[in-house]
């Protein structure tokens, strides 16, 4: 059972743990590109507390409108500001964070879209509504990670451990997560 939530244009979700605000302003059903706006407050990070991760099936694009962000791709840091862009090729380990003293506002795109809008809307909604599923530092419970990453297979994996191992582990743990009460806010399309 999932909760009754849908993604509508203009939906805004705040993940206070990571100091990030998601604004779903782009096309919602475009199979080629998933696009949303993101605001990171000072000290804010994306990717779950600046957790290094990979997107095996999509390239990730960042276009900054205001402020500065740092994007670390395969250990190489780049700082980008207004009008500048960074591209993370699929499969490359990366994370991003606000690199300035003011909020950073930017657009994130995934090509192809896969179901990244649903993936991030789920995560942000859960972080906003179910804070007890997270540590005080904002780290999601491991069973929640297993459920989310199994539900949205081939969207995001942790950098480091072999992806095949993560797939097997998350497939085993996802039913346990459901038994413990963890749920998605939005069903995957399908």
Predicted segments with their positions:
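Jelly-roll (double-stranded beta-helix
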Residues: 1-35, 44-58, 63, 68-190
